[in-house]
Amino acid sequence: MKGLGLPTEGEAISTKAKNDKYHRILEAAVTVFAQSGFHESTISQIARAAGVADGTIYLYFKNKDDILVHFFNYKTRQVFACFREEVDQAQTAVDKLRNLIRRHLDEFQKDRFMAVLYQAETHRINRLAEKQIHEMHKMYLDLIAEIVEQGQVEGAIRRDLYVGLVKRYIIGGVDEVINTWLHSDGKYDLTSMADPLVDLFIRGIGTQQELNG
């Protein structure tokens, strides 16, 4: 089998162990960054949280900045894939929007450390993961635009509104709801805010037909 270029059992186990350690370090870093703040965090803190030696960190990442970039490359794309899947399960634009917002709030509620880090870094002026944040933001806006355009075709969303304005109105509302929840130390159920929030959106952008329906 080795002649075919397939990994041996030992190589497969070694690769899995490396991947497991990579993800363990990444998850530990997210927790440390969220609790201590990115600039105040140290490699030693991350290593301790991950249960590895300080030097092990450098086998996977160049430095603390590199860990942050990997977080946005891996974790946020993983979450976005969940958003896409949730949207695709619905038929109408309003249901797609409801599924998207509900899943967004649910994912952030399930992983509060991720939510803290994501919100902090996306609002920072000098962002270390600028490229990754920009790409993630664009993917999310494009997904909302897709839903809005479908809603306009269906007659559920007003056609006199600019799609660019509507999608920023939606993402701004979601962002504010998450920030308010974080500032309250997560004292209430974030996911339960999804339906009321979407109802507010529809009252603002929905057609009379949709509101009467």
Regions found by a protein language model. Give the residues of each.
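C-terminal peripheral helix-coil segments that are non-catalytic and often amphipathic
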Residues: 1-9, 99, 103-106, 142, ...
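Basic, helix-initiating cap at the start of DNA-binding domains
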Residues: 1-36, 41-49, 66
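Short hydrophobic/aromatic patch on the recognition helix
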Residues: 51-61
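Alpha-helical DNA-contacting segments of helix-turn-helix folds
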Residues: 68-75
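Hydrophobic alpha-helical connector segments
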Residues: 70, 85-110, 167-170
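Amphipathic alpha-helical packing segments from all-alpha helical-bundle domains
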Residues: 77-84, 128-154, 164-168, 172, ...
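Amphipathic alpha-helical segments used for helix-helix packing
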Residues: 109-128, 180-183
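Short, hydrophobic secondary-structure boundary micro-motifs
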Residues: 115-118, 159-161, 190, 212-213
